[in-house]
């Protein structure tokens, strides 16, 4: 019997962008604990860098697929690809957030409607979409982990819309857990 805590477990890691990503550090820990991992990249702009990073650190055979968390079709297609590798998922990491640069600084009062919609969609609603898509595959003791920050509870200068989005993410987490 293996002494690795996650031996035989499958983790889906959403949000690795580079070697400084919190998602990358979590994926390394899960991998070292024995988990089999499946990753995403977000769009062609990040594809080559993410593929190189994942394959150099986790092996050439580790699956990495395109995923646009703002598209239900993309989310569903991603999990169809995941199903080609496994019929169960034990842990899902949601490490995704976005707010347009202009919505992070200055007065929060100047936040535009489009920036608000985009930020909440990508930073918070994506957890709901990913959870719904993975739910049929989740093991009985499965876990979904989402990344937040102090700015969800306290005002942090130059965090503005991201703080509101993280507060929404935390609320989504509570309702999903209920």
Model-derived features with residue positions:
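Short-chain dehydrogenase/reductase
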Residues: 2-118
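Catalytic loop of short-chain dehydrogenase/reductase
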Residues: 15-24, 97-136, 140-178
